[in-house]
Amino acid sequence: MSGRKKTREPKEENVLGPAVREGEHVFGVAHIFASFNDTFIHVTDLSGRETLVRITGGMKVKADRDESSPYAAMLASQDVAQRCKELGITALHIKLRATGGNKTKTPGPGAQSALRALARSGMKIGRIEDVTPVPTDSTRRKGGRRGRRL
């Protein structure tokens, strides 16, 4: 047996996120799906393939009726912004989506407050795009021939 000591080479530190120069922004895409039952904030890379963070309004509040509320959306987007900063993302493109199809094309109550909270928490906002699915010729809407009677 040899009497010499084994020396370990110092390992390189693994840094999360891309390498960027000073003053440069790293973009992600925030997919905000605001229905009348919940608000999803889902951040991916620019291609949309890799999920970085996904938080819903329902994960932030106890009561089911509050899942889609502006308050729950605000809490969710604050969490998303914090996690994005940890990963090194400094700017976001926004893709806003309502239920769409043959249902409502209006975004739910959490959409606006989610967007505002992202901007207020220090994330730079790039493009804002509405990606609500609009039917070219849809299946029949629920409610029947005479419609929903109130």
UniProtKB/Swiss-Prot annotation:
Ranges where the record places region Disordered: 129-150
Coiled coil location: none
Keywords per UniProt: Ribonucleoprotein, Ribosomal protein
GO cellular component, one term: cytosolic small ribosomal subunit
A Gene Ontology BP annotation from the UniProt entry: ribosomal small subunit assembly
Compositionally biased spans, kind Basic residues: 141-150
GO molecular-function terms, A-Z: structural constituent of ribosome
Family, as annotated: Belongs to the universal ribosomal protein uS11 family.
HAMAP family: Ribosomal_uS11
Protein's UniProt name: Small ribosomal subunit protein uS11y
Species per Swiss-Prot/TrEMBL record: Zea mays (Maize)
